[in-house]
UniProtKB/Swiss-Prot annotation:
Its biological purpose: Catalyzes the reversible interconversion of serine and glycine with a modified folate serving as the one-carbon carrier. Also exhibits a pteridine-independent aldolase activity toward beta-hydroxyamino acids, producing glycine and aldehydes, via a retro-aldol mechanism.
Organism in which the protein naturally occurs: Saccharolobus islandicus (strain L.S.2.15 / Lassen #1)
InterPro entries, alphabetized: PyrdxlP-dep_Trfase, PyrdxlP-dep_Trfase_major, PyrdxlP-dep_Trfase_small, Ser_HO-MeTrfase, Ser_HO-MeTrfase-like, Ser_HO-MeTrfase_PLP_BS, SHMT-like_dom
Site features described as Plays an important role in substrate specificity, chain residue numbers: H226
Gene: glyA
Listed name of the protein: Serine hydroxymethyltransferase
């Protein structure tokens, strides 16, 4: 029997996606990454067909003995690389992790302080997302546009006046660390909790190029496991022994998650092991690359945000492209050349301009994992110039992009072969392999 046409089309689309995004494009979306072949090999397993409601060894289903083992191992590994005491991997995304934390910390009608939306706050922090769905009132903290950060003095005054149930730091446009240690004492002084959304920078935290929020006074930290931490899509919650974590952990199931997509667990564990051995070098190269790309773009005439601060300390670069037609137009133009970025609000944009903002948000973490370094950032900046400023033929630039990718198809910062696995032999690795 021949394949049904519908099935053929499904296979064609999947193959086309794999060829396009894995071999022909410069993937510069700040919220994406790529797993290693090793992590992908354990992602596709029987775990994806199974259920395991509840916590390890306290399940509501039978047949979970290996689920309990891999979940416990994965949490232990994540705590080890994070230097934390508590980890819960059941949230299926960073937004679900935020929802669980927010729901425990506040009731409908309560107040929470966040960074301004146009200055990088994630939609889940706002009335348009999770906070709004939970009936929690969000109030934006004062923002220092020059320093691209929360205004510490004004924020302290607001905390003292508003007395919120919690304060959220972290964001989705996130160039420089928010003032955790500066605000934490004042948050706690009014009886509030400090929540740090590290979805974008978790890989930089465990890679030790970004300060640990938990060590600077955050009560709880939420993360995504697929941005600068290059694992499977999912979320996690960490703490350093806080009572808040215990409360949140008790409510993840059944309030926000039933089954928690068990095939994520072995892939997360493998990625944690990779980051244990390669995470610091990976994170360091990410930050070198982002700075190199920012400088190269600025040298070619682009208005890169944060010049007075060195442009960036994260994996991200933000560029104002209003003079070329705005973020929406330019993001689409770059996609035509196989350069994948996203349009983004900049700190001086109005929230209602979200569909056509001033800026582009660029992330270097995925192409760094494919082995690109500072010299390639120069090449990428030149490709941007050819498309946006020089207005070169898009198809010609697209060919250059495809040729460039031919040399960067192999995932780095992982174990290359079984000899590497033997070299770094450990009890944890033997359990996975």
């Amino acid at each position: 029997m021949s394949f049904p046409k519908e099935l053929e089309r499904v296979l064609e689309i999947t193959k086309a996606q794999n060829v396009w995004r894995r071999t022909q494009t410069l993937n510069l979306i700040a919220s994406e990454n790529v797993m290693s072949p090793l992590a992908e090999s354990v992602y596709m397993s029987d775990f994806m067909s199974r259920y395991a409601e509840g916590k390890p060894y306290k399940r509501y289903y039978q047949g979970t003995k290996y689920t309990d083992e891999i979940e416990t191992l994965a949490m232990d590994l994540m705590n080890e690389i994070t230097n934390s005491k508590d980890c819960d991997l059941r949230p299926t995304s960073g937004t679900i992790a935020n929802a669980a934390v927010f729901r425990v910390l506040a009731e409908p009608g309560d107040k929470a302080l966040i960074a301004p939306v146009q200055a990088g706050a994630h939609v889940s922090h706002t009335k348009f997302g999770t906070l709004g769905a939970l009936g929690i009132q969000h109030i934006e903290m004062p923002f220092d546009e020059e320093n691209i950060n929360v205004d510490v003095d004004k924020a302290i005054k607001m905390i003292e006046e508003v007395k919120p149930k919690f304060v959220v730091l972290g964001g989705s446009l996130y160039l420089f660390p928010h003032p955790t240690k500066e605000l934490a004492p004042h948050v706690h002084a009014v009886g509030a909790k400090l929540v740090y959304d590290a979805a974008h920078v978790y890989g930089l935290i465990e890679g030790k190029v970004w300060s640990s929020p938990l060590k600077e006074g955050a009560d709880i930290m939420t993360v995504s496991t697929h941005k600068t931490f290059p694992g499977p899509q999912g979320g996690a919650i960490f703490s350093d022994g806080s009572e808040v974590f215990k409360q949140v952990s008790r409510t993840i199931f059944p309030w926000f998650v039933s089954n928690h997509h068990l095939h994520r667990l072995p892939a997360t564990a493998v990625t944690a092991i990779e980051m244990k051995y390669f995470g610091e070098s990976y994170a360091n190269q990410i930050t070198r690359n982002s700075k190199a790309l920012a400088e190269a773009l600025a040298e070619r005439g682009f208005k890169v945000i944060g010049e007075n601060l060195g442009y960036t300390k994260s994996h991200q670069v933000a560029v104002d492209v209003r003079q070329f037609g705005g973020g929406n137009k330019i993001a689409k133009l770059l996609e035509d050349a196989n350069i994948i970025v996203n349009k983004n609000l900049l700190p001086y944009d109005k929230p209602e301009n979200v569909s056509d903002p001033s800026g582009l948000r660029i992330g270097v973490q995925e192409m760094t994992r494919y082995g690109m370094k500072e010299s390639e950032m120069e090449e990428i900046a030149e490709l941007f110039k050819k498309v946006i400023i020089d207005k070169k033929d898009i198809n010609e630039v697209k060919k250059e992009v495809i040729d460039m990718r031919k040399n960067f198809l192999e995932v780095k910062y992982t174990f290359d072969d079984m000899k590497d696995l033997e070299k770094y032999s450990s009890k944890s690795l033997k359990l996975i392999i």
